[in-house]
């Protein structure tokens, strides 16, 4: 393209410091180096993880930074040695890459590729430098993506090619929240038909976990949230029962135990609250219940329960990105969406122009949105 090998000047939302609104700026995006791809971002969504880092409690948070990791767009140019992508390809950036050769990628039990983990955690490209600058200052990258910008540079292992007819303002959600929730029952818990399941927290991840339980054939899916306004949506995704946790004096584990003859086969924590993680484990059935942690708790927080809970046959697990090996799985999830097998549109509660990005954060903090998609 005419921009090939050139610095691109474009609009981005910059987080100059923690706890402050994002600032719309013109930034410079350098061309991709070896094994990097520069993409034009067409749509991006706002996730709680972006807010978590902006809030200042993320131990890996660095500023100034371009946040955003749920995005979709097209390849603008590729660096040297890139063979799997060409300009014009429809792509989704992946915050968990899949290099295909590290010991994690070679192990079928995990999706946690470690090839670029260290530099990604420091907000850098794999060579330890940044491609983003603003007003003479270098900006950090975020989660290997930085989609709150008209252009982004990502490692070629942190990207997948998807069907060109897939709408970017929908499939961007498969880059994080929807895939995270949907995969946990299928890949991590391996929910069997007829199982009973409970989902704690009815944000995008919780709703997607409900959908995963339904697809797995669960007979009962109990949705739990303090905000009963979330229940209507939960039923659309497949919840059979909805419970407000503090509606009774009894602990929620007792309420659920009475509803299910002793507890759930599977529970999913989609909040990121260590107290709820404990309740989710203790709501599992003795002898075989499994609880999966999906929520991200604040840095330094610890989970606790009595060892007897595990000695008597409960299992505590966790998952990142729903256990999906990213490069091979996300294109299939996009195909499933295009074929009507999984719901994605129903997660989009708001669509806003990119300039209204701070409003998207406000909607999320107020509990008024599931996902707000920003059109670039």
From Swiss-Prot:
Reaction(s) the record says it catalyses: a primary alcohol + NAD(+) = an aldehyde + NADH + H(+); a secondary alcohol + NAD(+) = a ketone + NADH + H(+); S-(hydroxymethyl)glutathione + NADP(+) = S-formylglutathione + NADPH + H(+); S-(hydroxymethyl)glutathione + NAD(+) = S-formylglutathione + NADH + H(+)
GO BP: formaldehyde catabolic process
Tissue/organ expression: Liver and gut.
Cellular-component GO terms for this entry: cytosol
The UniProt record lists the keyword Oxidoreductase: yes
CC cofactor: Zn(2+)
Sites annotated Important for FDH activity and activation by fatty acids: 117
UniProt-annotated binding residues for Zn(2+) 2: 99, 102, 105, 113
Enzyme class of the recorded protein, top EC level: oxidoreductase
Record key words, sorted: Acetylation, Cytoplasm, Metal-binding, NAD, Oxidoreductase, Zinc
CDD domains documented for this protein: alcohol_DH_class_III
Function recorded in the entry: Class-III ADH is remarkably ineffective in oxidizing ethanol, but it readily catalyzes the oxidation of long-chain primary alcohols and the oxidation of S-(hydroxymethyl) glutathione. Also acts as a S-nitroso-glutathione reductase by catalyzing the NADH-dependent reduction of S-nitrosoglutathione, thereby regulating protein S-nitrosylation.
Subunit structure, interactors included: Homodimer.
Family: Belongs to the zinc-containing alcohol dehydrogenase family. Class-III subfamily.
Protein name listed in UniProt: Alcohol dehydrogenase class-3
Species name: Myxine glutinosa
Organism phylogeny: Eukaryota, Metazoa, Chordata, Craniata, Vertebrata
């Amino acid at each position: 393209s005419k921009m090939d090998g050139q610095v691109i000047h474009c609009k981005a939302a910059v987080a100059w410091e923690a706890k402050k609104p994002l600032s719309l700026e013109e930034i410079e995006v350098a061309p991709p180096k070896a094994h990097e791809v520069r993409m034009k971002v067409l749509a991006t969504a706002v996730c709680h993880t972006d807010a978590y880092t902006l809030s200042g409690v993320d131990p890996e948070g660095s500023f100034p930074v371009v946040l955003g990791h749920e995005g979709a767009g097209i390849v603008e140019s590729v660096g040297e040695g890139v063979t799997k992508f060409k300009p014009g390809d429809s792509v989704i950036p992946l915050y968990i890459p899949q290099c295909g050769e590290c010991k994690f990628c070679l192990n079928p039990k995990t999706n946690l590729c470690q090839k670029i983990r260290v530099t990604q955690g420091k907000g850098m490209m794999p060579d330890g430098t940044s491609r983003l600058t603003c007003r003479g200052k270098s900006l950090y990258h975020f989660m290997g993506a930085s989609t709150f910008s008209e252009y982004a540079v990502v490692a070629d292992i942190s990207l997948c090619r998807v069907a060109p007819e897939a709408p970017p303002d929908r499939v961007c959600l498969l880059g994080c929240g929807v895939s995270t929730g949907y995969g946990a029952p299928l890949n991590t818990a391996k929910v069997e038909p007829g199982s009973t399941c409970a989902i704690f927290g009815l944000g995008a991840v919780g709703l997607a976990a409900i959908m995963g339980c339904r697809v797995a054939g669960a007979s009962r899916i109990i949705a739990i949230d303090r905000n009963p306004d979330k229940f209507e949506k939960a039923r659309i995704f497949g919840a059979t029962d909805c419970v407000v946790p503090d509606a009774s004096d009894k602990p929620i584990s007792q309420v659920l135990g009475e509803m299910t003859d002793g507890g759930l086969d599977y529970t999913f924590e989609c909040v990121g609250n260590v107290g709820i993680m404990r309740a989710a484990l203790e709501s599992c059935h003795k002898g075989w219940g499994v609880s999966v942690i999906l929520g991200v708790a604040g840095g330094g927080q610890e989970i606790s329960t009595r060892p007897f809970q595990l000695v008597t046959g409960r299992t505590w697990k966790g998952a990142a990105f729903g256990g999906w090996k990213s490069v091979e799985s996300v294109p299939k999830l996009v195909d499933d969406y295009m074929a009507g097998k999984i719901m994605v549109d129903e997660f989009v509660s708001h669509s806003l122009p990119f300039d209204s990005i701070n409003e998207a954060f406000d909607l999320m903090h107020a509990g008024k949105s599931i996902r707000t998609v920003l059109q670039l």
